[in-house]
């Protein structure tokens, strides 16, 4: 099973991908984790990413796409994978489609978690309060202003990816406003398990 999770920050993509990862024993692939692993392993793409990151730059699409192309060839991804946090743009979605064609693979589905912006802000504020109550450090991007910027960026850059996948008949929209277990059940129903 090869899946992509889409949705705004705070929608529950990480929570739901982790549940599917555990249920189906397939890796959840995070672009940030993959970049760090490629740098640590000293792969050619990792070395290129390291040079860019060390200079304070943003890693360009072709480097991120190269890391994903390498990662999905690893043995643990043979039976499938869940991409969380990628693709973020239509250009990246097109590049992913090209990679999969070259590898004779296809996505089984693209799950989009739909959550109202006001509910997202409330979730982030709640997460920050829970972290404080536990004595944990609040994530830098969990303050309301930073979150609003992330949400604006999502609507401008990542939301069009939904239309891209809808046009290919791969998009499965799921109401992410429900309780976690209900969202999980809706995802499984959308995937027809």
Curated annotation (Swiss-Prot):
Any one GO molecular-function label of the UniProt entry: adenylate kinase activity
GO cellular component: cytoplasm
Keywords, comma-separated and alphabetical: ATP-binding, Cytoplasm, Kinase, Nucleotide biosynthesis, Nucleotide-binding, Transferase
Region span, LID: 126-142
Pfam families: ADK (PF00406)
Catalytic activity: AMP + ATP = 2 ADP
EC number: 2.7.4.3
Any one GO BP annotation for this protein: AMP salvage
Chief location of this protein within or outside the cell: cytoplasm
CDD domains membership: ADK
Positions that bind ATP: 10-15, 127, 178
Pathway: Purine metabolism; AMP biosynthesis via salvage pathway; AMP from ADP: step 1/1
Region of interest (NMP), ranges: 30-59
Sites where the protein binds AMP: 31, 36, 57-59, 85-88, 92, 139, 150
Subcellular location: Cytoplasm
Family, per entry: Belongs to the adenylate kinase family.
Domain notes: Consists of three domains, a large central CORE domain and two small peripheral domains, NMPbind and LID, which undergo movements during catalysis. The LID domain closes over the site of phosphoryl transfer upon ATP binding. Assembling and dissambling the active center during each catalytic cycle provides an effective means to prevent ATP hydrolysis.
Binding partners and assembly: Monomer.
Known role: Catalyzes the reversible transfer of the terminal phosphate group between ATP and AMP. Plays an important role in cellular energy homeostasis and in adenine nucleotide metabolism.
The protein's name in its UniProt record: Adenylate kinase
Organism: Methylocella silvestris (strain DSM 15510 / CIP 108128 / LMG 27833 / NCIMB 13906 / BL2)
Gene, per the UniProt record: adk
